[in-house]
Amino acid sequence: TGTQKVLANFNGAGDAIGWEDYLASLPALEALSKESTDSGKLLYASALVLKAQEDKTYAGGMIASLSNPWGDTASADKAQTGYKAVWPRDFYQVTMAMLALGDRVTPKVAFEYLENVQTSDKTPGYSGTPGWFLQKTHVDGKVEWVGVQLDQTAMPIMLGWRLWKEGVLTDAEMTTWYDKMLKPAANFLTDGGTVNIDWLKNVTITPPKTIQERWEEQTGYSPSTTSAIIAGLVAASDIAKLAKDDESAARYLAAADKYSSGLEKNLYTTSGMLNKAPSDGNYYLRISANEDPNDRGLLGVSNGQENVNESEVIDGGFLELVRYGVRSPLNKEIQNTLPEIDDTSLPDIVRVKYEFSVAGKAEKLPGWRRYGKDGYGEDTSAGRGYNATGKNAPDGRGRVWPIFTGERGHYELARTAANGKLNDEELSKLRNTYVTAMEIFANEGLMIPEQVWDNVGSNQTYNFTAGEGTNSATPLAWSHAEYVKLLRSYADKKVWDLNASTSARYVK
C-alpha cells in the first residue's frame, strides 16, 4: 500500500535514504550498546532523537526539544515556541553527543550554524560589544530571549576546539572560524563589555559574573558557568596559537588563570546554612550574587520563590569543574560539597537527592533536582502543572532531572579513575547505577523527559508514579545527549567532555 511504501522510504529501504541509513553511518553505536544495560534500545532511540532535533530548513540548527513543557495547560489559541528553539548550551550537549556516536558531519554543520546566533553589528535591535551568543533564538536566528549567559558564549569555543582536535575541522578551517566567530567570543569572556538589547539597557558585563547562569534565572558567580568560561578560554588560547595570534593566546590564559584562582574565594562557603550532619556548612553554592559566598545574600525572585538565601541553595553545578578539567575529582572543595548534594535528611524544599526503587533490583537508583527551592514544576498543594493557573505558584516544585544522574555518573567515573580503582568490577557498578537509572527514567516510548516525579506533595492531578516522567519537556534533547555521552565515557574509561588542555593546566 501507499502507506507501507512511505514507511519503507522513511526507514531507508532499498535505494531510499532513511533513518536506518543514518544509524548505519554511526560507527560507535555497536561499542556503546555494550555499555548500556538495556541492550542498546535507549541508545538507538537517542541517536534518532538527537538527529531529529536538527531543523530541516536551517541545517545545523539544533533545538532543545520538539515539545512545549506542560503543553496540556498551554493555550493553543496562538503559537508558542516552547523548547522548539536554539539555546547554545543545549546545542553544545547535543552536538557533542552526536560526535560521541561517530557522526562527523552533523556536528560540523551545527558548528558552522552558530554564526547565526552570535551578536554582532548585524543583530537586529542590538548595540554594544559583539561576540556573545544569544540566549534563545528561533532556528532562523530571530531573537526570542536575550539574557547574557556566559557559558553559552564559552561552549561554541569548546565545541570548535574539540572538532579541531578530532580532525573534523582542519587547521585552515579552524583559523578561519577563530577570526570570524571564536575570537570575538573569547574577547567577550576576557574583557566583558556593554550590552544594549531589549530589557538589557546598557548593562555592563564583567566576567566571570554572568547575567544568568545555566538555569537562566540568577545573576552572579556560578560554578557551572565559570567552569565553562575557563575551559572555553583555554581552548581559545590553543586556537589563537594556531592562528599565530600569540598576544590573544596569552590574554586568554591569563583571564582563565584569574577566574580559576577566584573559584573557591567567590563560590565556596565555609559558613553555610546547611550545617547539620552529614552536611557541615562547607560547600559550593549554586550561585553567589557577589564575591562573598559567606554573606548569605538573597537571590532574585524566580518561579514563585521569594526571599531565598543563597546559602541554603545547592546544586550539582560544581561537578562541571571536574567535567571540563578545571578541578581534580579529588579536589578538597569538590569532595566537601558531595555530602550536601547527597543529604537525603534535608527538608524537601532544599533537598536535592532522591532515590527510586526498581522492581527486581535491590539497590535504589539515584536522581537529583536542579537545586534546592526550585519552583519550576508541579505545585505541591494540588500537583498541577507548572504555571497551570497562569502565574507562578509559590509552592511550585522543580522535580528530579535525569540529566543529573548522568552528570554524577561522569563524576564518579572520573573519581574512581583518579583513585586508581577503575577496573571492570567498579565500572560495572557505575554502569548498573547511573546508566540503568537513566534508562529507567525513559518512558515506554524510549523518550527521556526533562523531569521525573519525586513523590513530594500532592499527586492528585496526574497520579504519577515515582520516577515517571512528568509533563515537562519530553523528549529533552539534553537528557538524551547526557545518556549518550555517559555511555561513550564509560566505553572510553574517561570523561568524553573533558578538555585536555584545561585539565593539563589545572589538575595537578
Regions found by a protein language model. Name each.
Residues 30-63, 112-134, 155-224, 247, ...:
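Active-site acid/base region of carbohydrate-active enzymes
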Residues 27-35, 48-53, 92-106, 155-173, ...:
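Well-ordered alpha-helical scaffold segments within catalytic/enzyme domains
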Residues 1-82, 171-172, 498, 505-508:
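Acidic/polar, glycine-enriched structural segments that form the non-catalytic walls/loops
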Residues 133, 391-404, 434-508:
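CBM-like carbohydrate-recognition segments
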Residues 34-42, 123-151, 222-226, 242, ...:
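Extended ligand-binding clefts on enzyme/binding-domain cores
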Residues 105-106, 181, 247-251, 255, ...:
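Alpha-helical positions within canonical tetratricopeptide repeat
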Residues 6, 10-16, 81-196, 222-230, ...:
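Aromatic-rich carbohydrate-recognition surfaces in CAZymes
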Residues 69-80, 131-148, 195-221, 292-304, ...:
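Acidic/His metal-coordination segments adjacent to aromatic residues that form catalytic metal sites
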